[in-house]
Design a protein with these regions (language model features):
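Glycan-processing catalytic domains of CAZymes
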Residues: 2-154
Length: 154
């Protein structure tokens, strides 16, 4: 099951609803796994581009420790989107996400965005060197299960 409502620090009270939905999905499906794919409130979020402050790695760790504590047992897979932070910060966030997932007994995937947020036209395909850098950062942080995000604009 993919619980698709993206939660973040602004909507962290949704985590209790997530827990209920996750438990319900497991109950009606015979215990199938549930997954969330939230975003990191980094420098490339729309809110930060509009003047909000990006979360530091430590602030991210504190906020997501609380959120994941609320959903522990109801969410099995944590797959943070990786496109909302700068490339030089990505590894640090990946390490924190992996440690939090391990703490709460969740599988940890990275949701590798295959479009480029660094371009003024949203969202062009990412250059291969950037994609490779993301994959390498995930590998160094101990991830063995990347997934991919892609939007089709018509």
């Amino acid at each position: 099951w993919y619980l698709s409502q993206e939660i973040s620090r602004r909507t962290k009270n949704m985590s209790r609803i997530y827990a209920e939905v996750g438990r319900h999905a497991k109950a009606v499906s015979g215990g199938l796994k549930t997954m969330i794919s939230p975003y990191i409130h980094g420098i490339k979020t729309d809110q930060v581009m509009a003047g909000d402050k990006a979360l530091s790695v430590e602030e991210h760790r504190r906020e997501w420790n609380e959120i994941l504590g609320n959903v522990a047992g109801a969410v099995d897979i944590l797959a943070f989107q990786d496109g909302q932070v700068d490339y030089h910060e990505l590894y640090d966030y990946l390490v924190v996400n992996k440690a939090l997932a391990d703490k709460y007994g969740m599988e940890c995937w990275t949701n590798i965005e295959s479009f480029d947020r660094d371009m003024p036209i949203k969202f062009l395909p990412i250059k291969f060197d950037k994609l490779r850098m993301k994959l390498e950062a995930a590998r160094r942080a101990g991830y063995d299960r990347p997934s991919r995000s892609n939007f089709r604009i018509s």
